[in-house]
């Protein structure tokens, strides 16, 4: 398995990154639904876990490129709550792979000023995986570069439900006035409270859905659907998605004329 942050300096890649930085504003937060490992493996005549192993190289390249670009937040949809319904041998192999990758790359994350975070229902995560996650999070918690968040045992419906449950409990205990509940307060109870909403959401493998990922947070995200299967996704596809993002006009419910007026003011 290749190590992270060992790519040789490429003048052309550096030029592309500098062009992206100077062309227009970069997304502060990129979310990626990494899909297509199983189909990639089937096409290659390999096992599904071989597809997941191949996908690790894509993670490495995208994390490295995002960090080099100065992206503040990168969230990778790694494993959904619904994925617990998959065959147990596949789940076990995935969890072992996650532990192996975290242990192998933790020091690289530390050295490259990347902070690891995780969102999801941790009660469903096996103890050995939680222990490895906790160790890596603690190791990198003082880093101030890019925040790389793993969405593990996560679903948008779960996130909204757990926020509602916590708010309802505080109202019941008399600690929260229902009249003070607004969008900002609600968002502060989501698992993503410490990060901005995604500006750009990328979904690989040619599927056109967001698969229960950050349902609240993606309200105004620009969504790019890539036909590339995740194990074949590399920084060039990431750059192309960012170029497309930079071409789009983000109106947030306003008209183009209103945005132009605000720019003049």
Swiss-Prot record:
Give the cofactor binding note.
Answer: Binds 2 magnesium ions per subunit.
Q: Is Disulfide bond there in the keyword field? A: no
Q: What class of enzyme is it?
A: transferase
Q: Which GO terms describe its biological process?
A: polyprenol biosynthetic process
The protein's Enzyme Commission number: 2.5.1.-
Keyword list, A-Z: Magnesium, Metal-binding, Transferase
Cofactors named for this entry: Mg(2+)
Catalytic residues (positions): 35, 83
| InterPro entries recorded | UPP_synth-like (IPR001441), UPP_synth-like_CS (IPR018520), UPP_synth-like_sf (IPR036424)
Q: Name one GO molecular function term.
A: magnesium ion binding
Report whether Protease shows up as a keyword of the record: no
Q: Which residues bind Mg(2+)?
A: 35, 222
Please list the residues that bind substrate: 36-40, 48, 52, 80-82, 84, 86, 203, 209-211
State the family named in the UniProt similarity comment for this chain: Belongs to the UPP synthase family.
PANTHER family to which the protein is assigned, alphabetical? DEHYDRODOLICHYL DIPHOSPHATE SYNTHASE 2, DEHYDRODOLICHYL DIPHOSPHATE SYNTHASE FAMILY MEMBER
Subunit info? Homodimer.
Q: What does this protein do?
A: Catalyzes the condensation of isopentenyl diphosphate (IPP) with allylic pyrophosphates generating different type of terpenoids.
Protein name in UniProt: Isoprenyl transferase
Organism annotation: Chlorobaculum tepidum (strain ATCC 49652 / DSM 12025 / NBRC 103806 / TLS)
Q: What is the lineage of its organism?
A: Bacteria, Pseudomonadati, Chlorobiota, Chlorobiia, Chlorobiales
Q: Which gene encodes it?
A: uppS
């Amino acid at each position: 398995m290749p190590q992270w942050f060992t790519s040789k300096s490429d003048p052309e890649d550096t030029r592309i990154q500098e062009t992206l930085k100077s062309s227009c504003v970069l997304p502060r937060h990129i979310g990626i639904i990494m899909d297509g490992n199983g189909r990639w493996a089937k096409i290659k005549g390999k096992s599904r876990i071989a597809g997941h192993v191949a996908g690790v190289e894509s993670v490495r390249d995208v994390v490295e490129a995002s960090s080099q670009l100065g992206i503040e937040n990168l969230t990778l949809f790694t494993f959904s709550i619904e994925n617990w319904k998959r065959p147990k041998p596949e789940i076990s192999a995935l969890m072992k792979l996650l532990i192996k990758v975290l242990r192998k790359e933790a020091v690289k994350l530390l050295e490259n000023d990347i902070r690891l975070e995780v969102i999801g229902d941790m009660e469903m995560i096996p103890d050995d995986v939680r222990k490895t996650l906790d160790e890596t999070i603690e190791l990198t918690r003082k880093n101030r570069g890019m925040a790389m968040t793993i969405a593990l045992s996560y679903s948008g419906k779960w996130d909204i439900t757990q926020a509602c449950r916590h708010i309802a409990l505080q109202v019941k205990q008399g600690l929260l006035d229902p009249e003070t509940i607004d969008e900002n307060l609600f968002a502060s109870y989501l698992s993503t409270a410490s990060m901005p909403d995604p500006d750009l959401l990328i979904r690989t493998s040619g599927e056109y859905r967001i698969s229960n990922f950050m349902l609240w947070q993606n309200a105004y995200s620009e969504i790019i659907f890539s036909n590339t299967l995740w194990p074949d996704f590399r920084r060039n596809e990431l750059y192309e998605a960012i170029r497309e993002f930079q071409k789009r006009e983000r109106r947030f419910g306003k008209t183009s004329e209103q945005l132009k007026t605000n720019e003049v003011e």
